[in-house]
């Protein structure tokens, strides 16, 4: 038989099979565009701006629709009401973690971010309790952040007002706060091993936001055998985990069961307590994955928010001037900012919230999954079905935030200039899977940004009207463009 005819017949059969599967499930899953065989709806999605495609599909199919990434159906939830219903009202039913193929290869479904079931619940509960015992959400962690913010200021002063690339110096501060909790030490800002870890994290976040990685996650079986940037991500994570393993071994050699120094010690003690339980989730592999999760998430997300925030403040000089005036009035120049100041600084508080809302760091959240068969609105979502929630559709809702594409702290101020809370503010997600480190991140952002603006004026290398704040990546997360600036002592 002619090879071309065989190919045509094969493709036709695949198309018919796909249509049959799609139609047979259409009475259950939400509506959506018809997928192609094997590749699904990938060609119908703008991989460089997935949120834009989701917005289009929501207008065609409604706030809940189905897309196929490869051969697997994914339910997409768009808009505040639908997102809240899925993650909050049905939080337990949708508390599963959807697949993120690159991390499955790296962490083997361990840790607190990408694990599932009993494993996830036990590791998350332990992590939250342990982080709290080391000051998370308490005055003690605030003291550490203040101390680190002061170290950052001293490091910036050493530049003597010369041109500075903030990429790595800003990552050092939040990373050192996390390191003090999990490793019981901080690093000098010039430490080569430390800077190498920061570079690996920065490089990975950029690669994870590339269109190639979205294709990889949709077609992992095929892509696994091809060269590509996914191999660089795995190599970088191997290097990071190798460093962490070295620190774990040091802790094992010096462990005092009665006096835990940090998160690693607490985990090792828990392992010892459960050593006779063959089903224990507390293993050396789980320790490695959990520490990696906390270290990576606690460093890079806050770093990017700080970096993006300074870029926005560099461009919007009128906002910066108002914040500095409030800092001078409430705090002055001779003491460090503290969290108690926040209630008397509504404009600064609004500025920090607006940075997070505007940059929309993780536009479509980390994927969730149904832990059981779920009746969601008028649809039936089978157990294991992946769920993507559009945080962009909430953070950039034009009814809650008029002109959402404009950076404006007024989005969080009432008519009297008082800070105004919004239920639509969910950069850390909501529900059972919301970010473990939300309280820490909020504290870091307020204290570090106010400390920088208390001590420095920001000066741009180019005219402020020429500053581009458009993200250079806009898939899994949003990455600001590279830039340089002058930190001029006040």
Swiss-Prot record:
Name of the top EC class for this enzyme: oxidoreductase
PROSITE patterns xref list: CYTOCHROME_P450 (PS00086)
GO cellular component: endoplasmic reticulum membrane; plasma membrane
Keyword list, A-Z: Endoplasmic reticulum, Heme, Iron, Membrane, Metal-binding, Microsome, Monooxygenase, Oxidoreductase
Residues that bind heme: 435
Chemical reaction(s) catalysed: an organic molecule + reduced [NADPH--hemoprotein reductase] + O2 = an alcohol + oxidized [NADPH--hemoprotein reductase] + H2O + H(+)
Compartments in which it is found: Endoplasmic reticulum membrane; Microsome membrane
Cofactor: heme
Sequence intervals crossing the membrane: none
Membrane-related topology note: Peripheral membrane protein
Entry EC number(s): 1.14.14.1
GO biological process, one term: linoleic acid metabolic process
Principal localisation: endoplasmic reticulum
GO molecular function, one term: linoleic acid epoxygenase activity
Upregulation: P450 can be induced to high levels in liver and other tissues by various foreign compounds, including drugs, pesticides, and carcinogens.
Tissue expression summary: Highest level in colon. Low levels in liver and small intestine.
Family indicated by similarity: Belongs to the cytochrome P450 family.
Function: Metabolizes arachidonic acid mainly to 19-hydroxyeicosatetraenoic acid (HETE).
Name used for this protein in its record: Cytochrome P450 2C55
Native species: Mus musculus (Mouse)
Gene: Cyp2c55
């Amino acid at each position: 038989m002619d090879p071309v005819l065989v190919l045509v017949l094969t493709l036709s059969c695949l198309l018919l099979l796909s249509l049959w599967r799609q139609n047979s499930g259409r009475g259950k899953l939400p509506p959506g565009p018809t997928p192609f065989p094997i590749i699904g709806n990938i060609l119908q999605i703008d991989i460089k701006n997935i949120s834009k495609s989701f917005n289009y599909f929501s207008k065609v199919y409604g706030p809940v629709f189905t897309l196929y990434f490869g051969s697997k159906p994914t339910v997409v939830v768009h808009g505040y009401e639908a997102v809240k219903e899925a993650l909050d009202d049905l939080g337990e039913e949708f508390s599963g973690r959807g697949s993120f193929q690159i991390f499955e290869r790296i962490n083997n479904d361990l840790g607190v971010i990408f694990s599932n079931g009993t494993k996830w619940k036990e590791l998350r509960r332990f992590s939250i309790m342990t982080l709290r015992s080391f000051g998370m959400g308490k005055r003690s962690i605030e003291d550490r952040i203040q101390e680190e913010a002061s170290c950052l200021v001293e490091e910036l002063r050493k530049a003597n007002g010369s041109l500075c690339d903030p990429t790595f110096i800003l990552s050092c501060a939040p990373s050192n706060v996390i390191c003090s909790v999990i490793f019981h030490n901080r690093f000098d800002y010039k430490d080569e091993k430390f800077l190498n870890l920061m570079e690996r994290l920065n490089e990975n976040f950029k690669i994870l936001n590339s269109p190639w990685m979205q294709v990889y996650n949709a077609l992992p079986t095929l892509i696994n055998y091809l060269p590509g940037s996914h191999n660089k991500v795995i190599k970088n994570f191997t290097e990071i985990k190798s460093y962490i393993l070295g620190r774990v071994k040091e802790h094992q050699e010096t462990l005092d069961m009665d006096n835990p120094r940090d998160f690693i010690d607490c985990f090792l003690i828990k392992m010892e307590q459960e050593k006779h339980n063959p089903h224990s989730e507390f293993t050396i592999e789980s320790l490695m994955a959990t520490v990696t999760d906390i270290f990576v998430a606690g460093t890079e997300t806050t770093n990017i928010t700080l970096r993006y925030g300074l870029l926005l403040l560099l461009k919007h000089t009128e906002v910066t001037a108002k914040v500095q005036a409030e800092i001078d009035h409430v705090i002055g120049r001779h003491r460090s900012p503290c969290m108690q100041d926040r209630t008397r600084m509504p404009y600064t508080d609004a500025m920090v919230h607006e940075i997070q809302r505007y940059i929309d760091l993780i536009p479509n959240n980390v994927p969730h999954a149904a832990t059981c068969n779920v009746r969601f609105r008028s649809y039936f979502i089978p157990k294991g079905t992946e769920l993507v929630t559009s945080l962009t559709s909430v953070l950039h809702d034009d009814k809650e935030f008029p002109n959402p594409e404009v950076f404006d702290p007024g989005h969080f101020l009432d008519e009297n200039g008082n800070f105004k809370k919004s239920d639509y503010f969910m950069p850390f997600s909501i529900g059972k899977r919301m970010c473990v480190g939300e309280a820490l991140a909020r504290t870091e952002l307020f204290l570090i940004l106010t400390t920088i603006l208390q001590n420095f004026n920001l000066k741009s290398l180019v005219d402020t009207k020429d500053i581009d704040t458009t993200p250079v990546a806009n898939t899994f997360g949003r990455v600001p463009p590279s830039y340089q600036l002058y930190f001029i002592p006040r």
